[in-house]
Amino acid sequence: MAVKIYKRTTNGRRNMSVLTFDEITTSTPEKSLLAPITKTGGRNNQGKLTVRHIGGGAKRKYRIIDFKRDKDNVPGKVTSIEYDPNRTANIALITYLDGEKRYIIAPKGLQVGALIVSGSEIDIKVGNALPVMSIPVGTIVHNIELKPGRGGQIARSAGTSAQILGREEKYVLVRLQSGEVRRILGTCKATIGEVGNESHELVRIGKAGRTRHLGVRPTVRGSVMNPNDHPHGGGEGKQPIGRKQQMTPWGKKARGIKTRDKKKASTSMIVRRRNG
């Protein structure tokens, strides 16, 4: 998908860019696969703020995506490629031979009219989903399950992918884009190909208003807050933070501290840590 850069007609338009949406074939979603989505403003069920910088944004409906790809050995035809406001990747509407319709994440190169299928003994073709144990070494995949039947959890964003590196007994080694090498149970499913809409990372938002339309609120520096709001706050005018190192808003060290739980069960599945 190409990127269109606007001319410098105003300060907001200067070097602003948008996707051209050449791959999108319809602007009307499948009504049976829509669900209401309620805005939370970053609050939990107690009304407490749990995620900062969330609020507002354009109204949207959730598209129900088939991450499990559990409709085995039933061919489906790609009916349309659509925009999804809830994710960076595009989605593809699949109509199966028995008449059922489902959305999947649209891989790079998937065209309207193409046939895809899920199963254990099928062709290695873009859009097909099969257990990672059945995928040849070196194949690029996305939408990878961490537990069989739970649905894909890894490599779902625009332009992301992973690569099958090898096999270890009942596990398969997968290298993620971060450089992390991870063991995946061989019965977990993955989809062939990389996620499409890889130009998404090239888009320049250009102005604050576009970010607000996306439902993202402003980020305020801790140094300009009051001391009761942030450890960096307070002082007359511009002041140093007054501490040996940077802190989070909750008073914890913000640099050089590992944030992953040391007792996390899946740590044993990580063969090599991610780069950086």
UniProtKB/Swiss-Prot annotation:
Query: What family does this chain come from, according to its entry?
Result: Belongs to the universal ribosomal protein uL2 family.
Mention one GO biological process in which this protein takes part, according to its record.
Answer: cytoplasmic translation
Which InterPro entries does the protein's record reference?
Answer: NA-bd_OB-fold (IPR012340), Rib_uL2_dom2 (IPR014722), Ribosomal_uL2 (IPR002171), Ribosomal_uL2_bac/org-type (IPR005880), Ribosomal_uL2_C (IPR022669), Ribosomal_uL2_CS (IPR022671), Ribosomal_uL2_dom3 (IPR014726), Ribosomal_uL2_RNA-bd_dom (IPR022666)
Renumbered to this chain, region (Disordered) spans: 219-276
Q: Is rRNA-binding included in the keywords of this UniProt record?
A: yes
Residue ranges with Basic residues bias: 252-276
Question: Which NCBIfam families does this entry report, sorted A to Z?
Answer: rplB_bact
Q: What does this protein do?
A: One of the primary rRNA binding proteins. Required for association of the 30S and 50S subunits to form the 70S ribosome, for tRNA binding and peptide bond formation. It has been suggested to have peptidyltransferase activity; this is somewhat controversial. Makes several contacts with the 16S rRNA in the 70S ribosome.
Keyword terms: Ribonucleoprotein, Ribosomal protein, RNA-binding, rRNA-binding
Q: Which PANTHER family match?
A: LARGE RIBOSOMAL SUBUNIT PROTEIN UL2M (PTHR13691:SF5), RIBOSOMAL PROTEIN L2 (PTHR13691)
What is the organism field in this record? Answer: Acholeplasma laidlawii (strain PG-8A)
Query: Which protein are we looking at?
Result: Large ribosomal subunit protein uL2
Tell me one GO molecular function of this protein: rRNA binding
The record's note on quaternary structure and interaction partners says:
Part of the 50S ribosomal subunit. Forms a bridge to the 30S subunit in the 70S ribosome.
* One GO cellular component, as annotated: large ribosomal subunit
* Alphabetized SUPFAM superfamilies for the sequence: Nucleic acid-binding proteins, Translation proteins SH3-like domain
- Indicate the secretion signal residues: none
The cross-references to Pfam families, in alphabetical order and at most eight, read:
Ribosomal_L2, Ribosomal_L2_C
SMART domains annotated for this entry? Ribosomal_L2 (SM01383), Ribosomal_L2_C (SM01382)
